Each structure stands twice: as structure tokens, then as C-alpha cells.
Regions:
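Short, flexible helix/strand-to-coil boundary loops that buttress conserved ligand/catalytic motifs
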Residues: 14, 48, 118-121
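Short, well-structured N-terminal submotif of metal-dependent ribonuclease cores
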Residues: 1-36
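A short acidic, often aromatic-flanked loop/helix-cap motif at beta-alpha or helix-coil junctions
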Residues: 42-43, 81-86, 131-137
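Acidic, PIN/NYN-like endoribonuclease modules and their adjacent C-terminal/linker elements
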Residues: 102-106, 112-140
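A residue-level structural signature of the nucleotidyltransferase/glycosyltransferase Rossmann-like core
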Residues: 2, 33, 106-107, 124
Length: 140
């Protein structure tokens, strides 16, 4: 399974004890492939610097790169086309473009703008992080 992680999910993923942490743990364990683009990594960096400071942002991004290299579960894509699936928020469009190019199954997000992907004909579908955890990471 391949997913794109929206920026609103990222900071909590790398916080011990946070409700979003199971997503990072599952990725560390190789349960899913995380698709990213350079634009997305730059946005991650910007938000992490604002929320956690430069040093912690660098550590988290380095961890993402290292785990991805070791596990082979970080899929980098370079979208050369914009599908304009989210015209109401062009900043979110980069996540949809990445997901479409990577043939991702889901975009993990709490952002309602991504609901435009539902029924759009594109494979990637938005999924709330709680639903992702319940559906894919909780033992049956």
C-alpha cells in the first residue's frame, strides 16, 4: 500500500505518545510505502521548523530519508504535470499530484479540501488518520 501524508499529520507522527505516532511506527515497520515529492518535503520542512525548531526539523527529515533508504519504503516522485484536482487550495494540489503520480492508495489527511478526490476517477482517496489507523493498523 502506498500513501501520501498531508502536512497536518506529520508533526504528531514523530511525537512519542501522540495519537498519530502509530502511523510513523507502521511506516518504520514497512507496512506501507510513503510517497513524497520535493515540494512536499519542502513544505514538511517549513512546518516542522515552525513547530519544532530547526534542529528537530533536520533530525526528523534526516530520519525520514534514512528509514526510507534502509527500508526502501520512501517513494520519491517528481510530478511534471498538475492535475488541478483541488482548485480551492492550490497548496494541497501538490499532495494530490504526488498521490496520482505515485499511484498511491490514500492521502492521510484531516483536510476537507481533499474530499474533491472522492469520485473523481483518480485512484488515491483521502482517508482520515483515525480511519487509517483503525482500518489498516489495528489488529482484527
Amino acid at each position: 500500500m502506498t500513501v501520501v501524508v498531508d502536512t497536518n499529520v506529520l508533526p504528531g507522527m514523530f511525537t512519542t505518545g501522540h495519537g498519530y505516532r502509530p502511523i510513523a511506527d507502521a511506516w518504520f515497520d514497512g507496512i506501507f510505502v510513503w510517497a513524497v515529492s520535493t515540494e512536499i518535503l519542502l513544505e514538511y520542512e517549513e512546518v516542522l521548523v515552525q513547530l519544532k525548531g530547526h534542529a528537530m526539523a533536520r533530525r526528523i527529515l534526516a530520519l525520514i530519508e534514512r528509514v526510507g533508504a534502509l527500508q526502501g519504503n520512501l517513494h520519491r516522485v517528481s510530478p511534471s504535470f498538475s492535475f488541478r484536482t483541488i482548485p480551492t487550495d492550490l497548496n494541497d494540489d501538490k499532495f494530490a499530484d504526488c498521490a496520482i503520480i505515485a499511484d498511491a492508495d490514500h492521502i492521510i489527511t484531516s483536510d476537507k479540501h481533499f474530499s474533491r478526490l472522492v469520485g473523481s476517477g483518480y485512484k488515491p482517496q483521502p482517508i482520515a488518520l483515525e480511519k487509517f489507523i483503525t482500518r489498516f493498523l489495528t489488529p482484527a
